[in-house]
Amino acid sequence: ERGKRVEERIEDVDKFWKTGMLNPASNVQFGEGGAGTFSDGKLNTLIHDAFGRGREVLKIFAEHGASRGILYESKPHIGTDVLMKVIKNMRQSLTEMGADIRFHSQVTDLSFSRDGERRRVSTLTVSDTMTGTSYLLPAETVVLAIGHSARDTFAMLKEQEVPMEPK
């Protein structure tokens, strides 16, 4: 996560709304929870979701502190204040299960090794968005949960010829 934790991020967003001063690494677009965190918590019911993914997301939100009403309301809504708590609770659940969530961290490059015909990621170059220093992080499996505003990351992946497909 190139931005800050949601509870730190709110300070940067409030400062922007009050003064117009933008923190490029922590704002409405960047930080834990992404752009949706400050969208006032309106949810899409995904009625036409044949695979039930939307329903599963709503259940996860409810399990982490959102009103259970979102599971049956025609226009589900969490609200920004509650959504920030839900996101914090989700982070806590993930870390309790062993997830390593690194804040102020931007993947700026990938290194690969060969496994026969296949390329496998072996190392990430990670830049600390607060200090500008970089470090190498060995990796066998990587989940890149990239928000829509991280165009620089998409450009790096394209340059590295990482297969991607549109949403």
Model-predicted segments: where are they?
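Residues forming the flavin
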Residues: 1-167
